[in-house]
Amino acid sequence: MALSEAAVKVQAALHERGLETPMLPNVFTPEERKDKIEFHMKEILTLMSLDLSDDSLADTPRRIAKMYVDEIFSGLDYENFPKITVIDNKMGFDEMVRVQDISLTSTCEHHLVTIDGTATIAYIPRKKIIGLSKINRIVRFFSQRPQVQERLTQQVLVALQTLLETKDVAVKMDAVHYCVKSRGVMDSTSSTTTTALGGIFKSNPATRAEFLNQSK
């Protein structure tokens, strides 16, 4: 299936800036990927001395394969990039548009455990306006791949800048990393904040302060 124009533009912009997730060319169909993941997951679970003949575990390798391909890592495939509605700014709206408390769930690429948090996104319209739900869908798309929070924040910024044809975009993410909470240091209270600011949000202290102060 051919990629959408929006997907092609965003992918090219990320490659140009060195912000694309490290990925190899995709040579398998979704079903082929599921079959191969299922096979190797059986090997992993068997090495952990789990009895896959048990009713509770028998279908686990296939369930994991489907979850990886269709859900939590579906953002690795640009065929899944959301359908984007961008319209001309005929009304000349030039004030900040802000969407906050966007839920995000991603996966740490170092240990493949959960990153759970929220995003706040703002932009100042120039020529284009985007459907508000599309902002949430873009966050979700880039969250559904192995990630580091810093790159995820930048990817969402560049995607919106590319689609809206403006640099005036700001992204802030607050998240709990389960590689910190459930293993290693076992810190159950800390969270991580990242920001990516473009255009006037980066160059104008008042605009930057307005965005960051309202994001608390």
From Swiss-Prot:
Q: In which pathway does it act?
A: Cofactor biosynthesis; 7,8-dihydroneopterin triphosphate biosynthesis; 7,8-dihydroneopterin triphosphate from GTP: step 1/1
Could you tell me the EC number(s) of this protein? Answer: 3.5.4.16
Q: What class of enzyme is it?
A: hydrolase
Q: Which UniProt keywords apply?
A: GTP-binding, Hydrolase, Metal-binding, Nucleotide-binding, One-carbon metabolism, Zinc
> Would I find Metal-binding among this entry's keywords?
yes
Where does the secretion signal sit in this chain? none
Cellular component terms, GO, for this chain's entry? cytoplasm
Mind telling me which PROSITE patterns this protein's record contains?
Answer: GTP_CYCLOHYDROL_1_1, GTP_CYCLOHYDROL_1_2
Per UniProt, where does Zn(2+) bind? 108, 111, 179
Reactions catalysed, as given in the entry: GTP + H2O = 7,8-dihydroneopterin 3'-triphosphate + formate + H(+)
| Pfam families attached to this UniProt entry | GTP_cyclohydroI
Any one GO molecular function term: GTP binding
Which BP terms does GO give this entry? one-carbon metabolic process; tetrahydrobiopterin biosynthetic process; tetrahydrofolate biosynthetic process
Please indicate which superkingdom the organism of origin belongs to.
Bacteria
Record's NCBIfam families?
A: folE (TIGR00063), PRK09347.1-1 (NF006824), PRK09347.1-3 (NF006826)
This protein's assembly is summarised as: Toroid-shaped homodecamer, composed of two pentamers of five dimers.
Belongs to which family? Belongs to the GTP cyclohydrolase I family.
State the name under which the record lists this protein. Answer: GTP cyclohydrolase 1
